[in-house]
Structure formats: structure tokens, C-alpha cells
Amino acid sequence: MPGKSRIIFHIDMNSFYASVEMAYDPALRGKPVAVAGNVKERKGIVVTCSYEARARGVKTTMPVWQAKRHCPELIVLPPNFDRYRNSSRAMFTILREYTDLVEPVSIDEGYMDMTDTPYSSRALETAKEIQSRLQKELLLPSSIGIAPNKFLAKMASDMKKPLGITILRKRQVPDILWPLPVGEMHGVGKKTAEKLKGLGIHTIGELAAADEHSLKRLLGINGPRLKNKANGIHHAPVDPERIYEFKSVGNSSTLSHDSSDEEELLGVFRKLAASVSDRLQRKEVMASKLFIMIRYADWRTITRSTTLRNPIDQKNDILKEAEHLFFKHWNKNPVRLLGITGTDLVEKEQAYKQLDLFSFNEDAKDEPIQQMMEKLNKKYGTKLIRKGATLKKEESKTKGTSFNKDFFQDEKKS
């Protein structure tokens, strides 16, 4: 993309939940602190922990009992989301004093485009000032990455924690990023890293030099995007309106009673797949990644995902992927809630399906029927026409809710 080089900051608050608790209670400072989902039960999971706790071997997602074994003096606190949201709002208020182009990414991190601001000629000094203000005014530590694009800024902010400021220029990518394991690259999860290793790609540098067609076959449209990022190329703008957009489309259903009945649970998934499919089609987008959520009777919650070779929006495709994930990861214990979410959305007209002969014949055969059913159901009600498999166990046993992130809803209101 032609034009002058941009100046992008990525602000990442350090151990945010634990830091907020320390800000509210000075007696906690300097002590090993963890915030856990269920403090009273030993099987609760650590959501975040202070650096003092990390130094003693405590890690995020670690069960509380295990964390206590590593650090017997660990102070475990329940989450206080009102407190975290208030601190988040205060943090973003400070950031917006420097530029209107602030893009919140989550409750504790965001991007700033400083290119056309009075601060562009003294980026490092401004970053130090922002970091100092967050520490003094909110008592919250942060790390800041400075780079010509969002991807590099994010990678830079991860390099020095806590209280780090890192400048990462595109010309430094070969020396600084390329030697790193590919799994340390932003946007590459554990499963993607394993797939890349199957191609002999172990470092970011090897990804940067990889064959684009091989990456596309392996990871779909995300493959070439990751290669660009590995080469320091990322043109996405800092977009303050991005939080108002649907980053995902999903629904969850809470069962009226805890159940381990397979047919009943599959019935819930059928309804969820239909709902997600309908919403994707109304928005004229398709999902490149699918998540399921399983919440057990003891409130332990897991999410599992799959990256799709081709984007999908049809109910049957969504259901097939959701069922596969469910039976792969369900431990047979009673379930309280199920959810399906499609993410990595792409516009329908930009998406394409690489069909083999079998799937082409199946799609060609089903498409007129699917379209007729969708039109009639939209006109006369969603229960007018259904396939035989969906008729079984149709009694209403669930309460539907949409997935939403409280933080993004909160940002929209503010």
C-alpha cells in the first residue's frame, strides 16, 4: 500500500485483572495473586495471575489446586468484572486523548494510529508518557509496541513485559522475528503451528519463505495472509468502529436440565446450527473458523475450534463441523450449555468453494431444495418445513442466548 509510513502503537495491559485488583487493594502489591473462575472449588481455573505468581510457576489456565501446589501462599480472588470494565474505560479514555484513531481489541488492549498527530515526530517519548500516565493515574502497568503496522506493533508489545516499550521496524523483521518459533507469531495458534510443522515450517522465517500455494492448500485464505505478516506486511487500518462490527456470529443454548443424552444434545446443536446459518446468510458473510462451547453441570467450560478449508454458511456444514468437535472433546459428563460460533468472517461474494466432484454433486443436488426451504421458512415461519432428521426430539428444552462479549457491548454504549 503506497503512502507514508504509519506509526502504530499497540497498548497491552500487563496481567490486567490481577493488576486491577492490586490497584484497588494496595496490600496485594508485590504478592503472588491470581484471579480464578471458581475460587471456592479446587478445580477452578486461573484466569490471570501477577508476575510474582508467575515467578513461582503459576500459569494462566492452570487449575487452582495445581497453582497452590506451585505457590502455597498464592492469593486467589474471584473475578470482579465491573471493576475491570471501569478500569478498561479509564484506560481507553487516556488513549483517546492522543488520537481519535483508537481501536479496542479486548478489555485490556488496543491499537492507536499516531501517524497524523502532533506526536508523530516523538513517538517514543509519547509512548513513555502514555505508559507513565497509565501507571500513575490508574496504577496499572502496560507494555507498548511501536511499529509501521498493527501486526508488528502487536509482536513488539509482547517482547518486553512488564512495563516494556519496543520499537519494531520492518527492516528488522529478518533479524528479530524470523528466528522465532512460528508458534510465537501472533495469529498462529497451537494447531496451526502443528500444521505448519507438517510442511517443514518451524520458524517465522521459514513461513516468510514458504510456497504460497502450499500454504493456501493447508490453511485456506489464511495461509497467504500469515505469509505476508511473517514478512512484516499488514495493511489493516486502525479502525475505531471495528468494535461495533460483528467479529463473530454465534448462539448458545442453556438446557432446562443438565443432560448427557446424545440425541437431546444433537437436537440442541441442530437448532444452533440453523440459527447461526440464518444469521450468517442475512449478513451475507461466511465463517472460516468454527468454535463450539461446552459448559458442564459443574460450570466448567471448554471451547474448541476448527479452521475450515473453505468458508461455510450452510446449516448442514456448520452442524457437521460442530458435531465432529463435540464428539471429539465431550467427556460424556452432563452438559448445561452448548454453543456454536462462526469467526474469521469473509464477505460471501469474496468467498469461494473449492469443490471436489463428490461435494459438487451433493451441493448441486441439495441447493434447490435448501433454497426453497429457506424461502418458505422465512416467509411462513422457521418450523414450516424441516428435514426428517430435525423432527426428532423437537420439544422446547432450551433457552437461547447470543454469544456476546460484555466488553464490546459496554464500549458501544460508552
UniProtKB/Swiss-Prot annotation:
Protein name: DNA polymerase IV 1
Organism field: Bacillus subtilis (strain 168)
Disordered: annotated span: 391-414
Occurrences of domain UmuC (ranges): 8-189
Keyword Chloroplast: no
Residues forming the catalytic site: 109
Cellular component per GO, a single term: cytoplasm
CDD domains listed in its UniProt record: PolY_Pol_IV_kappa
Catalysed reaction equations from the record: DNA(n) + a 2'-deoxyribonucleoside 5'-triphosphate = DNA(n+1) + diphosphate
Enzyme class: transferase
PROSITE patterns assigned: UMUC
